[in-house]
């Protein structure tokens, strides 16, 4: 008799018949099991049938996937994938429109299954679908529902990666692009057309060229002015794909075209400031657009200044002229010789705060920030001239060594902003932290620089800094900026107000508050008390982590970014013995019941938890593997027999919660950054509560000394 681990108990359904309760021996061939089921209902030709799941996406069961069947699973006896594909192929070409519509509905559903998709594609199903679309002008006006299902099936089939996107014809591309450009088209058709075009652009460089010729900026921007956020999301996703795949020499042209069509202001008014909350996928696409826009600065950021280029040197002359000679040209002054002018220029460049007073062009030879720093300085000097002149003259007139060097500050600040905003980095698959204020101005980076250079000047004065304190000031300014950004101000003015509240004295107060637990609680008695309390705190954190796992979390399925989001959910049983998980149709807003999660893993079967590049799905997905931030959110459960459950957490917080909780289940230490932070916070609070009675009492560093022995013990009385 086979061991219990090879036996799974399932229920198998068939329309119009009572369900069969069956014990499946996983060592038996699947064909033998199907024959037994067919015999139970007296069905001939068992080779025409197969098993599939009754719930969820109703995936077919194959020899490769049968190990996923768990005890208590409900299965269906169904027509085999090859037979179903053949029948649907015939029905999709039926003369009856009702038959074709029903066939397309079923095809759109079954195409998500890779087993069925392989069979259908092997019958040239993709070619049949593309021909239906290519000849579909009449179809669009009368049978838009059928066209929507056709496009859905096509996208599902192509998404499996079985065939290359390069097989798509130019006629098909023109037809899909036509649906996007038509003013009145069914929402479902438009949504799928945008998704198909995005997939083409992302998966084929040759198709990018063709689509870029067919789709205009104006056509895509018009879809951002609708009230349907899903259409807006797909439109921005296609814009991002075109932006991402465009050759470097054409990206700036695309950005200019977007500016001419007022893309930024349309997104601001119709998406960000719309009356609907921003969904996760929209937030991600806005984040991607923000990153790609800032990445346009990378070329200037990595370009060194050529000291021999007169045009570039003229920019530095212009900075000097605006600051000191706005109304006059010293070269025309009577008796002004070359040597005298050079001496005056050197003095002026020193007052401007350049490190190299004789040849300030040398200050811009370091990359980053390269020429981008000079661009920022010129923008400030021309667009915010009063601010520029005030900053320069205010510091150049000081005689007490407390002047803030504008040139050096501007260069270092530009470099800092590039680091904070990760200019030049590719978008992260798992992030959605866009900043609304960057969509409020066409020159957002330059405006941000203008705000921050004023902040730097203000902080310099508050610190009464000298040249030796330059790096300290830059550290404080970085802290001010990074503390202000997470609040996501809606405008640059709000950001400026937030920075104003984060003065140097406030930063000191925050630092002192954050260091209090480290600075104030280092005496031996306090350390001993901390060590006594710490196990209680860690147990409290452990219970919180396990409770969060019992509540569960939703995770996005890998590889579905360019289509409608798909989610799966995982939660721990209340007795902490089983992990339940399963697919979802939508991202849940509340708790998902155990009954709706079809799969489960006994905690006792879990062998290990692996993270990052050790995860199987990170080794398989080369594109994901290259993304450092996705790697930092990836983890996998390894369980018997040689199976894995792969996760990509939505954010760092959820990642830490799950890593801690799973580690606690396995009896291992919780070592995440979140645990350390929670432990320190809770320890600090508990210590303060326990030490309230000792307020204003100095706790000695050492125990009190033992007194000397008395000269005699005559005071001791012995009872007889």
Swiss-Prot record:
<dbReference type="GO" id="GO:0007015">
    <property type="term" value="P:actin filament organization"/>
</dbReference>
<dbReference type="GO" id="GO:0048870">
    <property type="term" value="P:cell motility"/>
</dbReference>
<feature type="modified residue" description="Phosphoserine">
    <location>
        <position position="503"/>
    </location>
</feature>
<protein>
    <recommendedName>
        <fullName>Engulfment and cell motility protein 2</fullName>
    </recommendedName>
</protein>
<dbReference type="InterPro" id="IPR050868">
    <property type="entry name" value="ELMO_domain-containing"/>
</dbReference>
<keyword id="KW-0729">SH3-binding</keyword>
<dbReference type="GO" id="GO:0060326">
    <property type="term" value="P:cell chemotaxis"/>
</dbReference>
<comment type="subunit">
    <text>Interacts directly with the SH3-domain of DOCK1 via its SH3-binding site. Probably forms a heterotrimeric complex with DOCK1 and RAC1. Interacts with ARHGEF16, DOCK4 and EPHA2; mediates activation of RAC1 by EPHA2. Interacts with ADGRB3. Interacts with AUTS2; the interaction is direct.</text>
</comment>
<dbReference type="GO" id="GO:0017124">
    <property type="term" value="F:SH3 domain binding"/>
</dbReference>
<dbReference type="InterPro" id="IPR006816">
    <property type="entry name" value="ELMO_dom"/>
</dbReference>
<keyword id="KW-0963">Cytoplasm</keyword>
<dbReference type="InterPro" id="IPR011989">
    <property type="entry name" value="ARM-like"/>
</dbReference>
<dbReference type="GO" id="GO:0006909">
    <property type="term" value="P:phagocytosis"/>
</dbReference>
<dbReference type="InterPro" id="IPR001849">
    <property type="entry name" value="PH_domain"/>
</dbReference>
<feature type="modified residue" description="Phosphotyrosine">
    <location>
        <position position="48"/>
    </location>
</feature>
<dbReference type="GO" id="GO:0006915">
    <property type="term" value="P:apoptotic process"/>
</dbReference>
<keyword id="KW-0597">Phosphoprotein</keyword>
<comment type="function">
    <text>Involved in cytoskeletal rearrangements required for phagocytosis of apoptotic cells and cell motility. Acts in association with DOCK1 and CRK. Was initially proposed to be required in complex with DOCK1 to activate Rac Rho small GTPases. May enhance the guanine nucleotide exchange factor (GEF) activity of DOCK1.</text>
</comment>
<keyword id="KW-0053">Apoptosis</keyword>
<feature type="short sequence motif" description="SH3-binding">
    <location>
        <begin position="700"/>
        <end position="707"/>
    </location>
</feature>
<feature type="domain" description="PH">
    <location>
        <begin position="553"/>
        <end position="674"/>
    </location>
</feature>
<dbReference type="InterPro" id="IPR024574">
    <property type="entry name" value="ELMO_ARM"/>
</dbReference>
<keyword id="KW-0581">Phagocytosis</keyword>
<dbReference type="GO" id="GO:0005829">
    <property type="term" value="C:cytosol"/>
</dbReference>
<keyword id="KW-0472">Membrane</keyword>
<dbReference type="InterPro" id="IPR011993">
    <property type="entry name" value="PH-like_dom_sf"/>
</dbReference>
<dbReference type="GO" id="GO:0016020">
    <property type="term" value="C:membrane"/>
</dbReference>
<dbReference type="Pfam" id="PF11841">
    <property type="entry name" value="ELMO_ARM"/>
</dbReference>
<dbReference type="Pfam" id="PF04727">
    <property type="entry name" value="ELMO_CED12"/>
</dbReference>
<feature type="domain" description="ELMO">
    <location>
        <begin position="310"/>
        <end position="484"/>
    </location>
</feature>
<dbReference type="InterPro" id="IPR016024">
    <property type="entry name" value="ARM-type_fold"/>
</dbReference>
<dbReference type="Pfam" id="PF16457">
    <property type="entry name" value="PH_12"/>
</dbReference>
<feature type="modified residue" description="Phosphotyrosine">
    <location>
        <position position="717"/>
    </location>
</feature>
């Amino acid at each position: 008799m086979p061991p219990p681990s090879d036996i799974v108990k399932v229920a198998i359904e068939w329309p119009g018949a009572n369900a069969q309760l069956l014990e499946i021996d996983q060592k038996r061939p699947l064909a033998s099991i199907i024959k037994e089921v067919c015999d139970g209902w007296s069905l001939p030709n068992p080779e025409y049938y197969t098993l599939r799941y009754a719930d969820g996406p109703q995936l077919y069961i194959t020899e490769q996937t049968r190990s996923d069947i768990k005890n208590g699973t409900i299965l269906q006896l169904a027509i085999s994938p090859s037979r179903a594909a053949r029948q649907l192929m015939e029905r999709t070409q039926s003369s009856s429109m009702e038959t074709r519509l029903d066939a397309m509905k079923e095809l759109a559903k079954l195409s998500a299954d890779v087993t069925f998709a392989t069979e259908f594609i092997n019958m040239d199903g993709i070619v049949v679908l593309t021909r239906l679309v290519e000849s579909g002008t009449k179809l669009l006006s009368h049978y838009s529902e059928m066209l929507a299902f056709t496009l859905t099936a096509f996208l599902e089939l192509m998404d499996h990666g079985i065939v290359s996107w390069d097989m798509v014809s130019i006629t098909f591309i023109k037809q899909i692009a036509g649906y996007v450009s038509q003013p009145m088209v069914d929402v479902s058709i438009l949504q799928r057309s945008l998704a198909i075009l995005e997939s083409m652009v992302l998966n084929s460089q040759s198709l990018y060229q063709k689509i870029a010729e067919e789709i205009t900026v104006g056509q895509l921007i018009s879809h951002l002015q609708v009230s349907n956020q899903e259409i807006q999301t797909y439109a921005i996703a296609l814009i991002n794909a075109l932006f991402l795949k465009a050759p470097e020499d054409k990206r700036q042209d695309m950005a200019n075209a977007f500016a001419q069509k007022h893309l930024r202001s349309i997104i601001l008014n119709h998406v960000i400031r719309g009356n609907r909350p921003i969904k996760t996928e929209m937030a991600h696409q806005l984040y991607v657009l923000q990153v790609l826009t800032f990445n346009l600065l990378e070329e200037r950021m990595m370009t060194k200044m050529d000291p021999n280029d007169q045009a570039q040197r003229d920019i530095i002359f212009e900075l000097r002229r605006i600051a000191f000679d706005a109304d006059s040209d010293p070269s025309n002054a009577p008796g002004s010789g070359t040597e005298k002018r050079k001496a005056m220029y050197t003095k002026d460049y020193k007052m401007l705060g350049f490190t190299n007073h004789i040849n300030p062009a040398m200050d811009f030879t370091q990359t980053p920030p390269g020429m981008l720093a000079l661009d920022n300085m010129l923008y400030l000097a021309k667009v915010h001239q009063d601010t520029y002149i005030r900053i320069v003259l205010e510091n150049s007139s000081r005689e007490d060594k407390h002047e803030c060097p504008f040139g050096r500050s501007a260069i270092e600040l530009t470099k800092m902003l590039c680091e904070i905003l990760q200019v030049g980095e590719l978008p992260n698959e798992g992030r959605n932290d866009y900043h609304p204020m960057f969509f409020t101005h066409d020159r957002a980076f330059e405006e941000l620089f203008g705000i921050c250079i004023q902040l730097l000047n203000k902080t310099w004065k508050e610190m009464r800094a000298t040249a030796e304190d330059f790096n300290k000031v830059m550290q404080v300014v970085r802290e001010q900026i990074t503390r202000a950004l997470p609040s996501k101000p809606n405008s640059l003015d709000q950001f400026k107000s937030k920075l104003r509240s984060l003065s140097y004295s406030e930063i000191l107060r925050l630092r002192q508050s954050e260091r209090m637990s480290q600075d104030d609680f280092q005496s031996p008695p306090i350390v001993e008390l901390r060590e006594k309390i710490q196990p209680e705190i860690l147990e409290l954190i452990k219970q919180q982590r396990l409770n969060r796992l019992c509540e569960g979390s939703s995770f996005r399925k890998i590889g579905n970014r360019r289509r409608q989001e798909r989610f799966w959910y995982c939660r721990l049983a209340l007795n902490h013995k089983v992990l339940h998980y399963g697919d979802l149709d939508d991202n849940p807003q509340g708790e998902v019941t155990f009954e709706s999660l079809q799969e489960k893993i006994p905690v006792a079967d879990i062998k290990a938890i692996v993270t990052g590049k050790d995860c199987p799905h990170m080794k398989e997905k080369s594109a994901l593997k290259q993304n450092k931030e996705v790697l930092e959110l990836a983890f996998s459960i390894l369980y018997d027999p040689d199976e894995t459950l792969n996760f990509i957490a939505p954010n760092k917080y959820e990642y830490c919660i799950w890593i801690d909780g799973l580690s606690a289940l396995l009896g291992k230490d919780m070592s995440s950054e979140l645990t350390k932070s929670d432990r320190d916070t809770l320890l600090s609070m508990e210590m303060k509560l326990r030490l309230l009675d000792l307020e204003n009492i100095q706790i000695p560093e050492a125990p009190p000394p033992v007194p000397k022995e008395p000269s005699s013990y005559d005071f001791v009385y012995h009872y007889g």
